[in-house]
């Protein structure tokens, strides 16, 4: 039996199937109890509808002309498709007589259609711009019918092969999406209809509640190839999801939470993308188009594909709004530049790195022209807003961090407007950070702020010497910052050469100490003394120090050395032995003062002095003991008879029989919060206190090379004796303990220099319990 191609009306096939069923029933009802029981390669539900039967199959092969409608690769599959009608009562010929030629034609067409619907994953999608015909069959450029299948690109979904009712609520849409996504995850190839969620309603849906956790994980499962065009995601939460090759055209994503959401290879044209302010991490767009899409001013567009803008009008939003073009994207601007708008739109340093400045700048360099144009439009808006200096002041740093860099420096309009802003920013930096350390520079600061400061010093060379504290910090961080570019380092080195040539600086560098010892810098090693800070009070005074020393003094740790520098007067090195570090920093180099004082407050040695020498009874002596801790060497000596007698009177009650009295020992434990501490912890503290009193008795503080106050030596030895009783294990050996004890008292011919004892004990403590030593020993003695 043959039928022509003209016999098939694709648009009426569903009705033809209904008529066919009626026809079969009419032809078989008078004693002919036959039913169709098997249709090869067709859906089970269709078999069930026609299921009957006994034997004597009659087969109808699909006509060759219908087969020829399809590509050659599909013929083998179609050849296998046979319609078998079993056990029609009466003879085969009688059965044939009851089925008309017209009905056979209808059966062929209907079953062919059903076969196609269930074999779609076996066909290649060959649509070349042709609109789909009803039922998923289309006509290609050569007018040959083709079949849509599961690999249909998301931007051109074909119509559903079977009419299905759309979900009626967001919950139903969510259930349908969950089912499709899980089938895709299981490896099933979805048809275009399966992935068609156009006009869907996902409002208020939290996707983490309907999808497995694997879809929210880093490098987890992906929602791939779905069509969400013209859908609603308002107030939904799509955080941490990855949409790949998806279509969102004309969709609404207002107030959607999309923290760390990834859109890749997707079509997001004509979308309202004003995501919720509760979005913590910005969404990312990788090889994604956003033509005429409205974007919030706090987006990262580093992977967006820009195209030429069309003549479309700005989008309409509730409450109105101003907009600027960024390529073919729309960026929202404030209606008025109020104080809140300035902070919200421009201050990324206050808003977790998010601002309209960073949004525009996030585009790749290949879009430089579009970036500059958008920034110029932004500057015009700011200029039109007539903002005061006070209003701009909080965002000066954010503005220069972006606009003072290429490609925006190429714009005369931007340069003219930014010039005064950058000058005010630089003046504020000089005022703020000349006498205090700069914040530890992170990547942002190294790449965006340090180059601006270099440029400002280059324009204002006098500031190099008038604000030597800030200038040296900037050079330090440029030379040591791991995220600084080679260009930044080269410019910093060149500027420092200009600084060294200044008449206020050059006298201090030709003394055989600076840099590589010949008056020039040596940036090959951080140990070279390359930095020279000028006194803030006396132009004849300077401090020379290395990169490592400058870094540690600006950001100290408990074991930082505060005397590892050269103090220069008229270019000559002078001793710091008689100089109090705190006074030196307060008067000449205040950039170190705050850090020094902060470390000093963590040293608790003074608490023991207050126990022994109360300010009420021994005010003058208390001040002498405290003042001595602020310098390496003291000019005050306590070896005269009156001083020795007074000290003996004070310390005798604390040392009955040469040992710590139980009451005084408990006072010490209480003062240092050691009452419940382990014996070893108590011993370590007493050992370090002994070290400090050994220093008091030495020639460096209250003693001389030939004499020292006996009461101080005896008290130091008593502290050490108690530490030995508590925990001998903290000592190097019993022999060393005995040696130190003999030196305190001059027994057995031991050399009685307590400076040697103090240094030896201090080295041991620094090696084995440094944190305890650092919490007690005065900074000037460390």
From Swiss-Prot:
It is an enzyme of class 2 (transferase). Residues 137-171 are annotated as: Disordered. NCBIfam families: PRK15377.1 (NF011904). One of its GO terms (biological process) is protein ubiquitination. Belongs to the SopA E3 ligase family. Its EC number is 2.3.2.26. SUPFAM superfamilies: Pentapeptide repeat-like. It comes from the Bacteria. GO terms for cellular component: extracellular region; host cell. Keywords: Secreted, Transferase, Ubl conjugation, Ubl conjugation pathway, Virulence. It is found in: Secreted; Host cell. The lineage of its organism: Bacteria, Pseudomonadati, Pseudomonadota, Gammaproteobacteria, Enterobacterales. GO terms for molecular function: ubiquitin-protein transferase activity. This is E3 ubiquitin-protein ligase SopA. Ubiquitinated in the presence of host E1 ubiquitin-activating enzyme, E2 ubiquitin-conjugating enzyme and ubiquitin. It holds the Pfam family SopA_C. Transmembrane segments: none annotated. Gene3D superfamilies: E3 ubiquitin-protein ligase SopA, effector protein (NleL), HECT-like ubiquitin ligase, Putative secreted effector protein. Residues 157-171 have a biased composition (Low complexity). The active site is at 753 (glycyl thioester intermediate). It catalyses: S-ubiquitinyl-[E2 ubiquitin-conjugating enzyme]-L-cysteine + [acceptor protein]-L-lysine = [E2 ubiquitin-conjugating enzyme]-L-cysteine + N(6)-ubiquitinyl-[acceptor protein]-L-lysine. Effector proteins function to alter host cell physiology and promote bacterial survival in host tissues. This protein is an E3 ubiquitin ligase that interferes with host's ubiquitination pathway. The keyword Transferase applies. The keyword Secreted applies.
